[in-house]
Design a protein with these regions (language model features):
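Non-cytoplasmic
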Residues: 38-55, 257-286, 295, 301, ...
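An internal, D/E-rich "acidic patch" concept
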Residues: 80-137, 389-390, 394
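Cytoplasmic-entry segments and transmembrane alpha-helices of multi-pass inner-membrane transporters
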Residues: 17-27, 139-176, 341-347, 404, ...
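Hydrophobic alpha-helical transmembrane segments of membrane transport/permease proteins
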Residues: 35-83, 185-199, 362-390, 542
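Transmembrane alpha-helices
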Residues: 28-40, 240-269, 407-420, 501-533, ...
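C-terminal transmembrane helix and the adjacent membrane-cytosol boundary/short C-terminal tail
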Residues: 298-340, 468, 514, 522, ...
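Membrane-cytosol interface at the C-terminal ends of specific transmembrane alpha-helices
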Residues: 193-233, 238, 456-506, 515-524
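Generic hydrophobic transmembrane alpha-helix motif, especially the helices
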Residues: 127, 156-209, 385, 434-475, ...
Length: 595
């Protein structure tokens, strides 16, 4: 008895030491990431190799001549001759005293404006999160209903793919035209009350809700396939208690992703805030990057990271409260994929989407996407199936050539993000800081940071998206690995002589790769959207390249006069999204059956 008590006491002490060590590593990761990011931002004006004084002169007045006297005056007034290190030290020392410095452009204090912008963004985030959770609930209802009635059901993801395939800037522009211009139900621009946030909240919440709904639906299907569901049902436990337990079990898997989605709602609203002229944190940080306003840029990035770290800690704490006992005792139930056969629609849907893209490519690749020989904004006809754009170019040709460009680039970036997320997710405590930082920085801000160093282009857009796109995959990997390693049979493997390498290759990895591959395929249209967003803002391929984002940007001013200039690239993007998600579901089932 005493020996058993001694063993239990030692085990509890080892667990406490592990938790303390893990918490210290996580805290150290966040601190190092925050410090490294601030230092990198402080060095940004000098990393591009251009004179910061010249960039500031051009930002203040494009007509003023860049004389040596004018540049010297700017360097002296802002202390640029001290170098980036001394400027960073001065900014940090002032921040500790409640002073974030003065704007290099306006000369006004930075902190009050950023605090007000953060308040606006948080309000918009809360309303967008409400829209996202409501939409995710609607998407998950069929899976939840069938699971309670004994059928482990995974949807084809058609509706969630449709929602995630809508670019936020395109959806925002559509809602602006319909809700504010045509119907006149909501104000079109500005921020003067909660009714100004309705259209922006819908534009931000609908794509996030489609993404969250698919992830949560997959997690629900996996939970309903666990053996304890059958045990509870046979034991006569009510459906209400089973439903509560299923929700608790599923939340433990997706809680880190919910935290990341909440953070991304704050940072990814740059385009939406720009379209609706909302004075939020994303728009303020975007303006600081464009203007090379270092104090405002540092403060904006700092606020984004603080919000990211707060929601990351909150999500991790809630998840630990849900799974604390199971993680400590290594009693996590094993998850298996639903044994349900592929439905007819799940087999036909990707074939239909692939056929549609193939027809688009066959019909459009032989056409010239650069030649302007048609009337401006010509409507669709037999000669112009998709119509013509504002410059008289064939939209079918431009969308077809843009499909090749965007799809190949998005696939390459998705594979890079999967590899990075899988590798980094295996060490969640060490890389928790970079993960939260990568998710806090929207692709637009990352694109601006990359463009400010290497210039605009497709390669810069791909680097920017890959630099931040791995974060959700890494978080998902960390959550899955934690649960897989807490299963009883995994805990018994070292006792049976199974080494670390074999344990991960033959037991952890097969249980991990299916959900991650589906997650990657679900993010493929999102990455294509991010590429389109950067192209829409002029940070991607240079004109007149037929890139999806640029085609969308060129057609947005004419949305009310000729909707077909936007409908064509948006439809192609929706088809790609639906095909990617439906193929991911089929791939996941085949992998599990082979395993």
């Amino acid at each position: 008895m005493s020996e058993s008590l001694y063993c239990r006491t030692c085990a509890r002490l080892n667990q406490m030491n592990y938790l303390v060590h893990g918490s210290l590593v996580t805290l150290l990761s966040r601190v190092i990431t925050l410090a490294g990011t601030i230092v990198l931002i402080g060095m940004l004006p000098w990393l591009s190799g251009r004179d910061p004084a010249l960039a500031l002169l051009r930002a203040r007045s494009a007509e003023q001549e860049a004389t040596p006297e004018a540049l010297a005056a700017i360097r002296h007034s802002l202390g640029l001759e001290q170098g980036p290190l001394q400027l960073l030290i001065n900014w940090i020392s002032g921040l500790l005293q409640g002073d974030a410095g003065k704007s290099w452009i306006s000369g006004h204090p930075v902190l009050p404006g950023m605090l007000q912008a953060a308040q606006v963004s948080l309000t918009l985030m809360i309303m967008s999160a409400g829209v996202a959770f409501l939409l995710a609930t609607v998407i998950c209802v069929p899976t939840f209903h069938r699971g309670l009635h004994g059928c482990s059901y995974r949807s084809t993801g058609f509706f969630s793919a449709i929602f995630t395939s809508l670019p936020e800037f395109l959806l925002a522009s559509f809602l602006l035209v319909v809700g504010a211009v045509w119907l006149e139900w909501f104000p079109p621009y500005g921020w003067n009350g909660l009714h100004y946030a309705v259209l922006p909240s819908l534009a931000m919440g609908i794509p996030a809700g489609g993404y969250l709904g698919r992830i949560f639906s997959d997690a629900l299907a996996a939970t309903f396939s666990e053996n304890w569901i059958i045990t509870w049902t046979v034991s006569g436990i009510s459906r209400w208690h089973i439903a509560c337990a299923v929700m608790k079990r599923t939340l433990s898997t997706v809680m880190p992703l919910i935290g990341l989605i909440l953070v991304s709602l704050t940072g990814s609203a740059v385009a939406v805030e720009k379209i609706f002229a909302i004075p939020g944190l994303g728009r303020a940080t975007l303006g600081a990057v464009v203007a090379q306003d270092l104090p405002a840029l540092q403060t904006g990035i700092l606020f984004l990271l603080i919000i990211a770290f707060f929601f990351g800690i909150l999500a991790a704490g809630i998840r630990y409260l849900i799974l604390g006992r199971a993680l400590r005792t290594s009693s996590m139930p094993a998850t298996k994929e639903p044994d349900e056969k592929n439905s007819r629609i799940s087999l036909i849907l990707p074939l239909v989407c692939a056929a549609a893209l193939a027809v688009l490519l066959l019909a459009g690749l032989s056409r010239d996407p650069y030649l302007s020989e048609f009337p401006r904004l010509a409507p669709p006809s037999s000669a112009l199936p998709f119509g013509a754009d504002a410059m008289g170019r064939d939209l079918l040709a431009r969308v077809a050539h843009g499909t090749v460009h965007t799809c190949i680039l998005a696939l390459i970036v998705s594979i890079i993000c999967l590899c990075l997320g899988l590798t980094i997710g295996l060490f969640p405590g060490v890389f928790v800081g970079p993960t939260e930082m990568a998710n806090a920085l929207p692709p637009v801000i990352a694109g601006l940071l990359v463009v400010s160093v290497i210039g605009p282009g497709s390669s810069g857009a791909a680097i920017a998206i890959a630099a931040v796109g791995w974060a959700p995959l890494a978080t998902h990997t960390a959550a899955l690995v934690t649960e897989i390693r807490a299963r009883p049979y995994i805990s018994m493997l070292p006792v049976m002589g199974v080494g670390w390498l074999r344990q991960n290759l033959f037991y952890v990895f097969p249980a991990l790769i299916g959900p991650l591959l589906r997650h990657t395929m679900l993010r493929l249209p999102g990455i294509a959207l991010a590429l389109a967003s950067l192209g829409f803002l002029g940070l991607g391929a240079a004109p007149p390249e037929p890139e999806w984002g640029r085609v969308l940007a060129e057609g947005m001013p004419y949305l009310e006069r000729g909707f077909w200039v936007v409908l064509a690239p948006a439809s192609a993007l929706a088809i790609l999204s639906v095909m990617g998600v439906s193929l991911a579901g089929l791939t996941g089932r085949k992998i599990k059956q082979r395993a």
